[in-house]
Swiss-Prot record:
Location in the cell: Periplasm
Disulfide bonds: none
Coiled-coil ranges per UniProt: none
Reaction it catalyzes: [protein]-peptidylproline (omega=180) = [protein]-peptidylproline (omega=0)
Regions crossing the membrane: none
Leader sequence residues: 1-13
Gene responsible for this protein: surA
GO molecular function, one term: unfolded protein binding
SUPFAM superfamilies linked: FKBP-like, Triger factor/SurA peptide-binding domain-like
Comment, domains: The PPIase activity resides only in the second parvulin domain. The N-terminal region and the C-terminal tail are necessary and sufficient for the chaperone activity of SurA. The PPIase activity is dispensable for SurA to function as a chaperone. The N-terminal region and the C-terminal tail are also required for porin recognition.
One GO BP annotation of this record: protein stabilization
Keyword Repeat appears in the UniProt entry: yes
Domain PpiC positions: 164-265, 274-373
Name of the molecule in the record: Chaperone SurA
Amino acid sequence: MLGALFLGTAANAAVQSIDRVVAIVDNDVVMQSQLDQRVHEVQQTIAKRGGGLPPPGVLDQQVLERLIVENLQLQIGERSGIRITDEELNQAVGTIAQRNNMTPEQFRIALSRDGLSYEDAREQIRREMVISRVRQRRVAERIQVSEQEVKNFLASDLGKMQLSEELHLANILIPTPESANSEAIQSAARKAMEVYQQLKQGADFGQMAVANSASDNALEGGDMGWRKAAQLPPPFDRELSSMATGDITQPARTPGGFIILKLLEKRGGESQMRDEVHVRHILVKPSPVRDEAKTKELAQSLYNRIEAGEDFAELAKKYSEDPGSALNGGDLNWIDPNALVPEFRAVMAKSPQGQLSKPFQTQYGWHVLEVLGRRATDSTEQAREQQAMTVLRNRKYDEELQTWLRQIRDEAYVEIKLPGADQAAQ
C-alpha cells in the first residue's frame, strides 16, 4: 500500500463530494470516499506495471473486500490497546523517506506534488503499523518451529536446495552427435582437452566459448547465470564444491558432449566464523541499603583486593550479585560479545587477556572483569539452522495468516451496501 504514496495523480481527486456508507463492518463502516481513493491507487499501480485492469465493478468489489479485512484488523488493534506514538510514526515516515533517497521534508514535498497530503500519508502509515502489530500478536507470536522440523528441513532435498550456495557459471560445450561412434567421441574428447589446455594457459574463457562452444549461450561467452549448487548434476556438484572463483573444470562427458565449466562467482553457503570471548566478572548492585557511591566503592575495593593477590573466583562467589555466574566464580564461559550490553562489550574489547579491568558501570550495576581467552568459532551450522528456522517460520506465518484472516472475516458482521454488489449480512 505504501507504494501508492508516489502515484502520479492525486488519489483524492477520485473522492466524491457526497460521501456515503458502502459497508458496515462490525462496529465501524467503510465509506465511499475510502473505496474510491483505494480503487484509484490500485488502478494507478496496475497501470504502472503495464497490466490490464479488471472490469470496474469487479475491481470495486475486490478492493472493498480488502478494506473490510483491514478494518476488522484495525478494530482488533483498537480493542487490544495498540497505539502508535508520534515518535514511532515519525521514525517510520523517516525510514520510508530514506528508502526513497529523500529527507523527510523532500518526502513531504513529493507527496504534495503528487496530490497526496502529508497528513493522509501519515494516517495510512499509522494504519499499516497497527495492522502489522495486530498480526504479530495474533499470528506470528503463536508460531512454533521444533528442532525436529529444522533437522528434517535441513535433511530434505528442498532444504538443501534453498540453503545451498549459489554459483555463477560459464560453460563450453564440445558436442557429440546423438548416434556418434567411438571415433567421433574420441575426436570431441581431444578437442575438449585442447580447449581446456588453452584455457589453463591463459586463454580468455568467453572468447573460447564464442569460438568453440555449441551451447545456446555461446555468444554470451558461455554465461549460464546463477545456479544453486544443489541443483547441479554429478559430477559437477562434487567438483565445484571445492573450487575457488576463477577455477575451471576438466572436460566432463555428458549426453550432449563434453562440458568445461568456469566458476565466475559464488555467494551464500560460506563458512561463517563468530568471535567468542571467555570472560569472568564480579557484579555489585546499588540497593536500598547501599547507594550508588557505596556500590562504586565496593567495586573499587574488590578490584584492589584482586590486584593485591586475592583469588578472583572466591571473591566472585562471595560478593557477585550475578546469579548466573557467581557460583561459578564469575565465569561467563565462552560468549558472543554481541549478547552483552554495549558498556560491558566495550570494556571487554579493550581489555588485554589476563588483565583485570578497572571498575565500570552498566545498567545492571558496577563490574570488574577479566578476559581469559579469545577465539573464532565456526558457526556455519548454527547459521544454517537459523536460516532453516526463518524459512519454516515464514512458511507457517503465510499459511496461518491466511487462515486467521478468513476466520475473522467469517466471524464478523458485514453488510455490503455497494450498488451492484451482492448484498451480504453476516
